[in-house]
A protein has these predicted regions:
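Conserved acidic
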Residues: 1-179
């Protein structure tokens, strides 16, 4: 991850005075008003209406993916390989359009929620914040790389909606996202 343009976001999260979960940072990112908070990232061009080639850059099972790739799963989980097994089973079923993927999705996503619940055995607010804030920063890094090549329309906690300048730009967009 290399955030070079919107370093104000990094500094905001590092500042101990901003550890209050009700605080937010409002900042224009790629010409779009954004709100960064401990619970997620949201930005959108107000009352946008447009035509053209739109791509929804959506990360499948974003929080579960982050928990596995960066080892941000609750430190109270005794066997992280079981979570990985559920994750891979869910993605396989989803690709097959099998409705049985839904219970797996619930298990994966509720694990993140359990990490923020002080009455749950998986309670681990540090790891939950790593997932949420780390995910936002990874998306911000992607926005920095995309903004010179397409129009950012909207972003949220697990994806970005962009408008291509030309249809032929899709391959370049795909390459940037794959990084």
């Amino acid at each position: 991850m290399r955030i070079e343009k919107y370093t104000e976001v990094l500094n905001w999260y590092k500042n101990p005075l901003n550890r209050d979960y009700s605080k937010t940072l409002e900042l224009d990112v790629a010409g779009v008003p954004h709100v960064f908070a401990w619970g997620g990232l949201h930005g959108a061009i107000p009352k946008y209406h447009g035509e053209g080639w739109f791509v929804n850059v959506d990360v499948a099972s974003y929080y579960p993916s982050l928990m596995l790739v960066y080892k941000w799963l609750s430190r109270n989980v005794h066997d992280p390989s079981k979570y990985a097994e559920i994750y891979h089973t869910r993605l396989k079923l989803k690709a097959e359009k099998n409705p049985m993927q839904q219970p797996y999705k619930i298990v994966l996503n509720s694990t993140y929620g359990a990490m923020k619940d002080k009455h749950n055995a998986m309670y681990d607010p540090r790891q939950a914040n790593n997932v949420c804030v780390g995910g936002q920063l990874l998306l911000l890094d992607l926005i920095e790389r995309l903004e010179d090549h397409c129009e950012i329309i909207q972003s949220n906690t697990d994806g970005i909606l962009v408008k291509l300048r030309r249809y032929e730009d899709f391959e370049m967009l795909d390459d940037l996202c794959w990084e």
